């Protein structure tokens, strides 16, 4: 019988979890993932720790999602990703649970807009739509730049930020 997401414990990622999560990302994504444009926006920037979540089953990491602060047109934006589910848990709804939880928590701590780079048919079920006029660093396909929240009148390049330029609710954990 298949597992259900109810059997999974959802917690906030801690600094001690960093390498375990990195190993999951390495397992789930192609080699060279760090060369992607989103990684350039994350370099040297603390993640939004309240939105970096882990899903564990019996203490074993089954899924993870991270969120990073960026800016578009001078406004704070939460950049979602990576999100990964261990191959033995794919198809159980765990990725969707992580995304819905991040959207809910982000709203409650004051993030007005979230974005990600991903597959529109998949992320559209959570309310994400294509962000016309929002430009990720190349080589990002503009059809994969998606957002949710208050994007009215906001366009421009997605820029890397330092922790001091993020909303007050941001409390990034230290990676050292």
Regions found by a protein language model. Name each.
Residues 1-39, 47-61, 152-176:
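Short amphipathic alpha-helix that is part of the acyltransferase structural core
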Residues 13, 118-119:
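Conserved acidic functional residues
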Residues 38-44, 134-136:
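Short, solvent-exposed loop/turn elements at beta->coil junctions and helix N-caps
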Residues 52-54, 60-70, 76-84:
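Conserved beta-strand in the GNAT
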Residues 89-101, 111:
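Conserved acetyl-CoA pyrophosphate-binding loop and the N-cap/start of the following alpha-helix
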Residues 104-118, 131:
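Conserved GNAT acetyl-CoA-binding A-motif
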Residues 117, 129-151:
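Conserved catalytic-core motifs of GNAT/GCN5-like acyltransferases
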Residues 123, 128:
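Conserved active-site tyrosine of GNAT-family acetyltransferases
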